[in-house]
Regions:
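ATP-binding N-terminal substructure of ATP-dependent carboxylate-amine bond-forming enzymes
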Residues: 1-93, 97, 119
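Short, low-complexity Ser/Thr-rich regulatory SLiMs
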Residues: 183-187, 245-249, 326
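Protein kinase-like catalytic core scaffold
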Residues: 192, 241, 253-257
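Active-site "cap" helix and flanking loop/linker of ATP-utilizing ligase/carboxylase catalytic domains
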Residues: 222-243, 249, 259-307
Length: 373
């Protein structure tokens, strides 16, 4: 089967690498004019002139990035199956619709307001109590389109810096850790769930994801499973869905945002789970049985950002797996990730710190459960 992928970056690349053993072929449609997948057949189409050529080659279509024109995906749906559907993109690329969906399904979120002026932003900051986080309703990812207000008087500056006509303003959450759920749903409605991962962000960009969590209460995992299962069923979803959450001090979970695709916080599954998120996504969209999501060992994903480190020394570390994206170095750019696998979380922390020391731009590792090791 020829899988069509909208986008030609590292997520599409890793989908292809997971799909070749399944006998899949891949055709990428790149609308940026700057593809970086370095694999498969790429149709570069910044002027939207080659959609018919793309459709003629593929059997089913998926995507690696949700910030696509909904109209493009809806047009493709007239000709080929698209998984996840355009409805998932429509919700996930608009924070107002996303929050409304969470509210409708009784999935708790931080308190929020929708504002359309600097004056409304200031009023919302006073009502919710600072600090608050202001986010663009559309186009925000990896910390872009956001500002933290420490006082209501900062509203005018924040409004101007974000530069959007509508913002979501969220109350600041005193969380213990940021976590994420990765789940996959097949065409037949079967759903499977990966163990929850703890994520460490710096400047809004993910740096480390670790799973499974040694101190995670079973009930918390079950609650997260229920939340994401509700979303999967409501959207009649097919493929991998990621749900990012805050875990508070009392163990409750607050939904932050979701992503309708394979996700950076699920990269640990490539070496730390029986079936990777990439293979399971491909199984789902082709109507194949879903693979086991069981973790085989404590695993940490380390993002390599901006500048590569000493890869030779890194590969000398036992059970350390380097996944390079074949991209040129540039400040803030995701170049690769490293999956570190160990028999215990104590050993894992030691190995991740050894890996971190070999990366020039890697921040210190901070895990919420470190004191219990």
């Amino acid at each position: 089967m020829n899988i069509g992928v909208l986008g030609a970056g590292q997520l599409g690349r890793m989908l292809a690498l997971a799909g070749y053993p399944l006998g899949n072929r891949f055709t990428f449609l790149d609308t940026t004019g700057n593809p970086s997948a370095g694999i498969g057949e790429v149709i570069v189409d910044p002027d939207n002139q080659h959609l018919a050529e793309f459709l003629a080659k593929v059997d089913v279509v998926t995507y690696e990035f949700e910030h696509l024109p909904v109209s493009l995906v809806q047009e493709i749906e007239k000709h080929k199956p698209v998984y996840p559907s355009s409805r998932a993109i429509e919700v996930c690329q608009n924070r107002v619709e996303e929050k409304a969906l969470f509210d409708r399904l009784n999935i708790p979120t931080p308190a929020y307001r929708v504002v359309e002026s600097a004056e409304q932003l200031e009023a919302a900051a006073r009502e919710l109590g600072c600090p608050v986080v202001a986010k663009s309703v559309t186009e925000g990812y990896d910390g872009k389109g956001q500002a933290v207000l420490k006082a209501p008087e900062e509203a005018a500056e924040a409004w101007q810096s974000i530069g959007h006509a509508q913002l979501i303003v969220e109350a600041f959450v005193d969380f213990v850790r940021e976590v994420s759920m990765i789940a996959v749903r097949g065409r037949d409605g079967e759903a499977v769930f990966y163990p929850m991962a703890e994520n460490q962000h710096v400047g809004g960009i993910l740096r480390y994801s670790v799973a499974p969590l040694p101190d995670l209460d079973v009930q918390v995992q079950q609650t997260a499973d229920t939340y994401i299962r509700t979303l999967l069923d409501e959207l009649d979803y097919v493929g991998v869905l990621a749900l990012e959450l805050f875990q508070t001090r009392d163990g409750s979970l607050l939904a932050n945002e979701m992503a309708p695709r394979v996700h950076n916080s699920g990269h640990w599954t490539m070496d730390g789970a029986v079936t990777s998120q990439f293979e399971n996504h491909l199984r789902a969209i082709q109507g194949l049985p879903l693979g086991s999501t069981v973790a085989i060992a404590p695993t940490c994903m380390v993002n390599v950002i901006g500048q590569e480190g000493d890869n030779v020394a890194m590969l000398k570390l036992a059970n350390t797996h380097l996944h390079r994206y074949d991209k040129a170095e540039r400040a803030g750019r995701k170049l690769a990730h490293v999956n570190v696998v160990a028999t215990t979380h104590t050993e894992l922390l030691e190995k991740v710190r050894a890996c971190q020391a070999l990366l020039p731009d890697a921040p210190p590792v901070e895990w919420s459960f470190e004191s219990s090791l």
